[in-house]
UniProtKB/Swiss-Prot annotation:
Catalyzes the oxidation of 3-carboxy-2-hydroxy-4-methylpentanoate (3-isopropylmalate) to 3-carboxy-4-methyl-2-oxopentanoate. The product decarboxylates to 4-methyl-2 oxopentanoate. This is 3-isopropylmalate dehydrogenase. The lineage of its organism: Bacteria, Pseudomonadati, Chlorobiota, Chlorobiia, Chlorobiales. It comes from Chlorobium luteolum (strain DSM 273 / BCRC 81028 / 2530) (Pelodictyon luteolum). PANTHER family: 3-ISOPROPYLMALATE DEHYDROGENASE. Keywords: Amino-acid biosynthesis, Branched-chain amino acid biosynthesis, Cytoplasm, Leucine biosynthesis, Magnesium, Manganese, Metal-binding, NAD, Oxidoreductase. Pathway: Amino-acid biosynthesis; L-leucine biosynthesis; L-leucine from 3-methyl-2-oxobutanoate: step 3/4. InterPro entries: IsoCit/isopropylmalate_DH_CS, IsoPropMal-DH-like_dom, Isopropylmalate_DH. Its EC number is 1.1.1.85. Substrate binds at R95, R105, R133, D219. One of its GO terms (cellular component) is cytosol. The gene is leuB. NAD(+) binds at residues 75-88, 276-288.
Length: 353
């Protein structure tokens, strides 16, 4: 039996998580195994109840489970709190306390939605790649950092173990995905830290002789992702470059409501849609649950090692979309849109009994 901690959070978080949990219930019923779900408050919802965005009880529950499912955090109600009490600080803390060092962001275009992309349909059709972004090092955390009246400074630094563990994760994923290709993204032509990154990735690659490794400069990668996204399978890169490239890749799909993510550590993992809490549509039952449901698909693949069930969920999403179901964010002008609940029910219907 697996144990999931559900932290729905704020805004549309509870609505999209409810849809994802309904999918989990259908999967366990269909395949005859059990998943225990334990819900805890997080973010603004937790602050309103307990005066803390992340209570010790919630954190301990997240430590004592197989996977964490997060909805969304934040909203205007809590924007004026001190930085250390803001929802974003709680999210950084939970990632740090769980030892999450890799962010996984898939860029998958469903056939039924090729026309929703801002790129031409023939460019994006068949796109299916994964960005592995290192989360704990690089310029976001390097010291020294600061600014005065005359200058500002930051330090981009990577330790050997930080590069090794993210590279190893990417190579292992490439082996499982079948095409066995990894593209390492850096700026080794001008940055010494990128030269170090490249050397370490190539050193780790010696343990994976069946995987093809290529290198690409980050500026070229940004261009290639929108020019020919199908050329990529697994991308591995540092914190700053990954932050930028994963957002570029994400827009290929046509809506933030389609984009799942996973943050992975040696023991723990947290799964969440990349969209925000969208307080303007919260409680209206119109949010797109697909990103959260696709995050559950990632959970089955990476935490539970059930790639077949992950594929089932993606196929059910594709089936619902092919049927013509669209929430408002992915509906074409004049096209009828469905509710959060209706989209969830459509996906469950395509999962089968």
């Amino acid at each position: 039996m697996y144990k999931i901690v559900s932290i729905p959070g704020d805004g549309i978080g509870p609505e999209v998580v409810a849809g994802a949990l309904a999918v989990i219930r259908q999967i366990t019923k269909k395949h005859g195994f059990e998943i225990q779900v334990e819900e805890h408050p997080f973010g603004g919802a937790s602050y309103d109840l307990h005066g803390s965005m992340l209570t010790d009880e919630t954190l301990n529950a997240c430590r004592d489970c197989d996977a964490v499912l997060l909805g969304a955090v934040g909203g205007p109600k809590w924007e004026n709190l001190p930085h250390e009490h803001k929802p974003e600080a709680a999210l950084l803390k939970i990632r740090r306390e769980l030892g999450l060092f890799a962010n996984l962001r898939p860029a998958k275009v469903y056939d039924a939605l090729v026309d929703a992309s801002s790129l031409k349909a023939d460019v994006v059709r068949g796109t299916d790649f994964m960005v592995f972004r290192e989360l704990t090092g690089g310029i976001y955390f390097g010291e020294p950092r600061g600014f005065d009246e005359k200058r500002g400074w930051n330090t981009m630094v990577y330790e050997k173990h930080e590069v090794e563990r993210i590279a190893r994760l990417a190579f292992e994923a490439a082996q499982k995905r079948g095409s066995k290709r990894v593209m390492s993204i850096d700026k080794a032509n001008v940055l010494e830290v990128s030269q170090f990154w490249r050397n370490e990735v190539h050193r780790v690659h010696r343990d994976f002789p069946d995987v093809e490794l290529s290198d690409m400069y980050v500026d070229n990668a940004a261009m290639q992702i929108v020019r020919n996204p199908k050329q990529f399978d697994v991308i591995v890169t540092g914190n700053l470059f990954g932050d930028i490239l994963s957002d570029i890749a994400g827009m290929i799909t046509g809506s933030l409501g389609m984009l799942p993510s996973a943050s992975i550590g040696r023991v723990h993992a947290l799964y969440e849609p990349i969209h925000g809490s969208a307080p303007d549509i919260a409680g209206k039952n119109i949010a797109n649950p697909i990103a959260t449901i696709a995050s559950v698909a990632m959970m089955f693949e990476h935490s539970f090692c059930m790639a077949d069930i992950s594929n089932e969920i993606h196929a059910a999403i594709e089936g619902a979309l092919s049927e013509g179901l669209r929430t408002a964010d992915i509906a074409a002008p004049g096209q009828k849109s469905v509710s959060t609940t209706e989209m969830t029910e459509g996906i469950i219907r395509h999962l089968g009994a």
